[in-house]
């Protein structure tokens, strides 16, 4: 065979492999079941932990990436996970599909799973405070990132391993949603509005209309990253809840600046130390707000800024807390003349300029915090549909700063600078114009209160779309005036600025970051699938790297006292 022909064959085979990786839906969790709390046998309240302990890996944050990362590493090494929140059995409403709105409605008492904050843009927002992270409080939408994200990420991915990591997650906690009336109508309207092609059911982020995966099963039970802890080795894995990590401990001995442990406090305010043994590491998985905050409090960040706060500079890192972005969420609420059934987001409309979806809801007396931009937004007195457009990327970047220079429990300040980049504003305008086309479809006619053409005839809750679909200035004003958070904020410790392509903090040994702070753009319309995969992926890469070096595997067995509340939770779970 000629060389050119052989090269062509190889190219075709490689493209086929990539196509299979990104287009085929592999096995999902296929039966509804209770949330699996088997892992509680190795979960402890931090008050019951030793004042000083040693572990191969210390993971700060038991959230979307932290849980799969911990489970993976525990197959070979001793692992401690430090989570500032508590467990889901303390808040059973987190475990149902109805809990999404309910948990946003609960007042923040300093312990609830949803921590409220208002960005310096003046927009309401939330972060998680529970084992399982945002996978315990979100809307359950599951998608894989697309090929272009990997190509532009600054990381040399092993795409076979990426695919295996996705499957590892999906087999445990991802479901194909059942048919929901409003979601079916949403899909029909997207297609009628020109969001093509019809991709049927699939998980990969790609242009067109599709039914995507969900972490809610068809009985309405939530499944989340905490359940992935069940895949870990219980003899090697310890999870401490209500453990607030205060700072990273560093050493400057002959090997250079090295992370050697962390200091954390329990709910009684007692200080503990967890130290790294052997060639282990500290891995930060505390999220977009928590990870940059902890780096700054530990003396890793912009030198002049740290000095101004009287924080001793351990390592000058000018980009810690920079490139913090949040995807704008703009929307229209319609109040149909007849009740519609509540539904979670399962149908997506994807284009290169915007991502769209919709949910339907019962009315409520207490507003779900951050569903609308501010608490002064009008409340629905009947069932309603919330039709959403998301700006990809985004290119508009903000920053994170400390509100307290000594107390990790005081949330940092963050400003996202929504739509400050003109490209983002253009994408928002395009998206909201497409929602105008969506509202004008035949599929949406039964949801009008008056039989009027185009976008007219709907009972709109809040700000309506501009009447003139060609008035870009009016749409730009709409985008600025109605912006809300999509809860998909990211960045602050990004690849190429703070960490390298192996997720190691540059200039510091034994310190990595594996969470949503690592990339300056959202990896898909809904990012939880990517970050679940990322925990498994990086954990597997670490095990492979250490195994290839011929290191002996270190294991240890933990037998501290179970806290009383977890004993009762165990009896509840089983």
Swiss-Prot record:
<feature type="binding site">
    <location>
        <begin position="527"/>
        <end position="528"/>
    </location>
    <ligand>
        <name>FAD</name>
    </ligand>
</feature>
<feature type="glycosylation site" description="N-linked (GlcNAc...) asparagine">
    <location>
        <position position="268"/>
    </location>
</feature>
<feature type="binding site">
    <location>
        <position position="516"/>
    </location>
    <ligand>
        <name>FAD</name>
    </ligand>
</feature>
<feature type="active site" description="Proton donor">
    <location>
        <position position="488"/>
    </location>
</feature>
<dbReference type="GO" id="GO:0046593">
    <property type="term" value="F:mandelonitrile lyase activity"/>
</dbReference>
<feature type="glycosylation site" description="N-linked (GlcNAc...) asparagine">
    <location>
        <position position="468"/>
    </location>
</feature>
<feature type="glycosylation site" description="N-linked (GlcNAc...) asparagine">
    <location>
        <position position="310"/>
    </location>
</feature>
<feature type="glycosylation site" description="N-linked (GlcNAc...) asparagine">
    <location>
        <position position="407"/>
    </location>
</feature>
<keyword id="KW-0285">Flavoprotein</keyword>
<feature type="glycosylation site" description="N-linked (GlcNAc...) asparagine">
    <location>
        <position position="151"/>
    </location>
</feature>
<feature type="binding site">
    <location>
        <begin position="138"/>
        <end position="141"/>
    </location>
    <ligand>
        <name>FAD</name>
    </ligand>
</feature>
<feature type="signal peptide">
    <location>
        <begin position="1"/>
        <end position="27"/>
    </location>
</feature>
<feature type="binding site">
    <location>
        <position position="245"/>
    </location>
    <ligand>
        <name>FAD</name>
    </ligand>
</feature>
<dbReference type="GO" id="GO:0016614">
    <property type="term" value="F:oxidoreductase activity, acting on CH-OH group of donors"/>
</dbReference>
<feature type="binding site">
    <location>
        <begin position="83"/>
        <end position="84"/>
    </location>
    <ligand>
        <name>FAD</name>
    </ligand>
</feature>
<feature type="binding site">
    <location>
        <position position="134"/>
    </location>
    <ligand>
        <name>FAD</name>
    </ligand>
</feature>
<feature type="glycosylation site" description="N-linked (GlcNAc...) asparagine">
    <location>
        <position position="179"/>
    </location>
</feature>
<dbReference type="InterPro" id="IPR000172">
    <property type="entry name" value="GMC_OxRdtase_N"/>
</dbReference>
<feature type="binding site">
    <location>
        <position position="357"/>
    </location>
    <ligand>
        <name>substrate</name>
    </ligand>
</feature>
<keyword id="KW-0926">Vacuole</keyword>
<dbReference type="Pfam" id="PF00732">
    <property type="entry name" value="GMC_oxred_N"/>
</dbReference>
<keyword id="KW-0274">FAD</keyword>
<keyword id="KW-0732">Signal</keyword>
<dbReference type="InterPro" id="IPR051871">
    <property type="entry name" value="GMC_Oxidoreductase-Related"/>
</dbReference>
<feature type="binding site">
    <location>
        <position position="486"/>
    </location>
    <ligand>
        <name>substrate</name>
    </ligand>
</feature>
<feature type="active site" description="Proton acceptor">
    <location>
        <position position="526"/>
    </location>
</feature>
<comment type="subunit">
    <text>Monomer.</text>
</comment>
<feature type="disulfide bond">
    <location>
        <begin position="428"/>
        <end position="479"/>
    </location>
</feature>
<feature type="glycosylation site" description="N-linked (GlcNAc...) asparagine">
    <location>
        <position position="30"/>
    </location>
</feature>
<dbReference type="GO" id="GO:0033095">
    <property type="term" value="C:aleurone grain"/>
</dbReference>
<dbReference type="GO" id="GO:0050660">
    <property type="term" value="F:flavin adenine dinucleotide binding"/>
</dbReference>
<protein>
    <recommendedName>
        <fullName>(R)-mandelonitrile lyase 4</fullName>
        <ecNumber>4.1.2.10</ecNumber>
    </recommendedName>
</protein>
<feature type="binding site">
    <location>
        <begin position="64"/>
        <end position="65"/>
    </location>
    <ligand>
        <name>FAD</name>
    </ligand>
</feature>
<dbReference type="InterPro" id="IPR007867">
    <property type="entry name" value="GMC_OxRtase_C"/>
</dbReference>
<dbReference type="GO" id="GO:0005773">
    <property type="term" value="C:vacuole"/>
</dbReference>
<comment type="function">
    <text>Involved in cyanogenesis, the release of HCN from injured tissues. Catalyzes the stereospecific addition of HCN to a variety of aldehydes in vitro. It is a major seed constituent, and could have the additional role of a storage form for reduced nitrogen.</text>
</comment>
<dbReference type="InterPro" id="IPR012132">
    <property type="entry name" value="GMC_OxRdtase"/>
</dbReference>
<dbReference type="Pfam" id="PF05199">
    <property type="entry name" value="GMC_oxred_C"/>
</dbReference>
<feature type="glycosylation site" description="N-linked (GlcNAc...) asparagine">
    <location>
        <position position="381"/>
    </location>
</feature>
<keyword id="KW-0325">Glycoprotein</keyword>
<feature type="binding site">
    <location>
        <begin position="487"/>
        <end position="488"/>
    </location>
    <ligand>
        <name>FAD</name>
    </ligand>
</feature>
<keyword id="KW-1015">Disulfide bond</keyword>
């Amino acid at each position: 065979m000629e060389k050119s022909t052989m090269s062509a064959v190889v190219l075709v085979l490689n493209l086929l492999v990539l196509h299979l990786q990104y287009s085929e839906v592999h096995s999902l969790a296929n039966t509804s079941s209770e949330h699996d709390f088997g892992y509680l046998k190795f979960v402890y309240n931090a008050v019951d932990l030793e004042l000083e302990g040693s572990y191969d890996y210390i993971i700060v944050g038991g959230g979307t990436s932290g849980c799969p990362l911990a489970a993976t590493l525990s197959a070979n090494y001793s692992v401690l996970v430090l989570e500032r929140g508590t467990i889901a059995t303390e808040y059973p409403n987190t475990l149902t599909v109805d809990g999404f709105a309910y948990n946003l409605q609960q007042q923040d008492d300093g312990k609830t799973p949803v921590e409220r904050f208002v960005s310096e843009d003046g927009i309401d927002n939330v972060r998680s405070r529970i084992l399982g992270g945002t996978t315990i409080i979100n809307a359950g939408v599951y998608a894989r990132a697309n090929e272009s994200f990997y190509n532009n990420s600054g990381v040399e991915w092993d795409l076979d391993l990426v695919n295996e990591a996705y499957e590892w997650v999906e087999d445990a906690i991802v479901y194909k949603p059942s048919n929901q009336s409003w979601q079916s109508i949403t899909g029909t309207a997207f297609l009628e509005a020109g969001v093509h092609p019809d991709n049927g059911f699939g998980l990969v982020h790609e242009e067109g209309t599709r039914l995507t995966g969900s972490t809610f099963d068809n009985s309405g039970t939530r499944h989340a990253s905490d359940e992935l802890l069940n895949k870990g080795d219980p003899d090697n894995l310890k999870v401490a809840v209500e453990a607030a990590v205060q700072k990273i401990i560093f050493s400057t001995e002959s090997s250079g600046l090295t992370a050697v442990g962390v200091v954390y406090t329990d709910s009684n305010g007692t200080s503990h130390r967890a130290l790294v043994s052997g060639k282990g590491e500290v891995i930060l998985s505390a999220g977009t707000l928590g990870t940059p905050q902890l780096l700054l409090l530990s003396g890793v960040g912009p030198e002049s800024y740290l000095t101004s706060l009287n924080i001793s500079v351990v390592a000058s890192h000018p980009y810690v807390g920079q490139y913090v972005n949040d995807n704008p969420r703009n929307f229209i609420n319609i109040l149909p003349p007849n009740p519609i059934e509540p539904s979670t987001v399962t149908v997506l409309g994807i284009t290169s300029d915007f991502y769209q979806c919709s949910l339907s809801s019962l009315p409520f007396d207490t507003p779900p915090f951050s569903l609308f931009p501010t608490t002064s937004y009008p409340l629905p007195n009947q069932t309603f549909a919330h039709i959403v457009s998301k700006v990809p990327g985004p290119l508009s970047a903000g920053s994170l700063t400390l509100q307290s220079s000594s107390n990790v429990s005081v949330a940092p300040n963050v400003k996202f600078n929504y739509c400050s980049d003109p490209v983002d504003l253009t994408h928002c305008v395009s998206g909201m114009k497409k929602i105008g086309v969506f509202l004008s479809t035949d599929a949406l006619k039964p949801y009008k209160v008056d039989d009027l053409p185009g976008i007219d005839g709907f009972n709109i809750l809040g700000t309506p779309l501009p009447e003139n679909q060609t008035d870009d200035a009016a749409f730009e004003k709409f985008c600025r005036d109605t912006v809300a958070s999509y809860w998909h904020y990211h960045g602050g410790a990004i690849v190429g600025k703070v960490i390298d392509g192996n997720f190691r903090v540059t200039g510091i040994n034994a310190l990595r970051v594996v969470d949503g702070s690592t990339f300056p753009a959202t990896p898909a319309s809904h990012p939880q699938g990517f970050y679940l995969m990322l925990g498994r992926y990086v954990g597997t890469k670490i095990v492979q790297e250490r195994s290839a070096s011929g290191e002996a595997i270190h294991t240890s067995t933990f037998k501290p006292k179970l806290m009383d509340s977890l004993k009762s939770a165990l009896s509840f779970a089983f």
